[in-house]
């Protein structure tokens, strides 16, 4: 039976999640989990599922807030939001960067086609109030300065942040990347606008229903829509319903990927979907060690069942994770399955 070098893995995990070697974090880990102190596989699983300490996470948020304060000096008619794994507490690095969205409030993209389709397909199920809301949106005036507004927000942000931060990389098409050296944190600043479809309009533009579109500096275009706030809301809600178990599984797979000798080409977006897709009743009453065979079963089913893998959707439900032609990503899934399989085999005598 293949066995992992758990001493090395545990050291990797500690360096990643507690890079400053804060003793109180290590002490708390062993006091909270006395059963794992002398057992390598249990110790690794426990730490791999644990969240990053708030001491680190709070610094990432604070670095984002400092950037926001600088931008508020020069930008008008924008709204600031955060996206990414820090917002769901599924990040695995103590020194995690954070994504600050700078969203224009001057305009929004209206998905007219989606609204027209909803009016036609759901005309007998929608209330009169909702029908009127959708119809009213279609009467709105078009806005013709969208790209220029976003370009201007990007240029002003570059100028301001370059004057404030010694490390400020403005070469990336979709983000400005700064490093706050005193805090040891990176922040990605992303220029965007709101995107509204029928669901957003019907739900009074509550943030979880609104999409965003990111500005691409290189092509001077607006990218396709994303729904980061719906994903954040769904992961947080499902994990709350399962007393943190969903987030434990997400962190576990992300740590396995990070510790693997193989190059596993699966993003956090992909791993979120893999875990979110598991029926919550399967793990609602499982302890942390019992989550490992549940993950093994999920990955094994995806690898062996073409219908299941081809139908797996993102957490927000708007896109498929594994396209039929993406062989590399499916191979990466097999690699991740193998990593889980080894841990599972080492764990079985303790279940």
UniProtKB/Swiss-Prot annotation:
Domain of life: Bacteria
Alphabetic keyword roster: Antiviral defense, GTP-binding, Nucleotide-binding, Nucleotidyltransferase, Transferase
Name the record gives this protein: c-di-GMP synthase
Family recorded in the similarity comment: Belongs to the CD-NTase family. E05 subfamily.
InterPro entries: NT_sf, Polymerase_NTP_transf_dom
Extra remark beyond the main annotation: Bacteria with this enzyme do not have other c-di-GMP synthase enzymes (no GGDEF or EAL-domain containing proteins), suggesting this second messenger has been co-opted for CBASS signaling via STING activation.
Pfam families in UniProt: NTP_transf_2
Biological role stated in the UniProt entry: Cyclic nucleotide synthase (second messenger synthase) of a CBASS antivirus system. CBASS (cyclic oligonucleotide-based antiphage signaling system) provides immunity against bacteriophage. The CD-NTase protein synthesizes cyclic nucleotides in response to infection; these serve as specific second messenger signals. The signals activate a diverse range of effectors, leading to bacterial cell death and thus abortive phage infection. A type I-D(GG) CBASS system.
Keyword Nucleotide-binding: yes
Catalytic activity reported: 2 GTP = 3',3'-c-di-GMP + 2 diphosphate
Keyword presence, Nucleotidyltransferase: yes
EC number: 2.7.7.65
Upper lineage: Bacteria, Pseudomonadati, Bacteroidota, Flavobacteriia, Flavobacteriales
GO biological process, one term: defense response to virus
GO MF assignments: diguanylate cyclase activity; GTP binding
Species this chain originates from: Capnocytophaga granulosa (strain ATCC 51502 / DSM 11449 / JCM 8566 / LMG 16022 / NCTC 12948 / B0611)
């Amino acid at each position: 039976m293949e066995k992992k070098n758990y001493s090395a893995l545990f050291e990797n995990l500690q360096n990643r999640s507690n890079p400053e070697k804060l003793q109180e974090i290590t002490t708390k880990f062993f006091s909270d989990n006395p059963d794992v102190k002398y057992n390598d596989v249990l110790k690794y699983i426990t730490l791999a599922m644990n969240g990053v300490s708030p001491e680190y996470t709070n610094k990432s948020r604070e670095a984002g807030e400092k950037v926001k304060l600088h931008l508020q000096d020069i930008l008008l008619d924008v709204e600031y939001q955060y996206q990414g794994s820090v917002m769901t507490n599924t990040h695995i690095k103590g020194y995690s960067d954070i994504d600050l969205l700078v969203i224009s409030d001057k305009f929004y993209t209206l998905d007219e086609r989606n609204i027209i389709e909803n009016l036609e397909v759901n005309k007998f199920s929608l209330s009169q109030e909702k029908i009127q809301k959708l119809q009213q949106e279609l009467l709105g005036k078009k806005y013709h300065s969208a790209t220029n507004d976003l370009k201007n927000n990007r240029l002003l942000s570059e100028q301001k942040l370059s004057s404030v931060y010694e490390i400020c990389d403005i070469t990336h098409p979709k983000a400005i990347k700064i490093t706050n050296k005193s805090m040891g944190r990176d922040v990605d600043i992303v220029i965007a606008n709101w995107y509204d479809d029928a669901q957003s309009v019907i739900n009074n533009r509550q943030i979880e229903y609104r999409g965003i579109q990111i500005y691409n500096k290189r092509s001077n275009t607006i990218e396709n829509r994303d729904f980061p706030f719906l994903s954040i809301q769904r992961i947080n809600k499902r994990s709350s319903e399962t007393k943190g178990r969903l987030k434990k599984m997400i962190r576990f797979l992300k740590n396995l990927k990070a510790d693997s000798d193989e190059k596993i080409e699966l993003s956090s977006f992909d791993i979120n979907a893999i875990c979110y897709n598991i029926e919550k009743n399967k793990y609602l009453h499982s302890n942390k060690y019992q989550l490992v065979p549940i993950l093994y079963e999920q990955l094994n089913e995806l690898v062996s069942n073409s219908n299941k893998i081809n139908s797996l959707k993102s957490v927000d439900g708007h896109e498929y994770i594994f396209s039929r032609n993406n062989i590399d990503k499916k191979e990466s899934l097999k690699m991740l399955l193998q990593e889980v399989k080894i841990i599972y085999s080492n764990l079985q005598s303790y279940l």
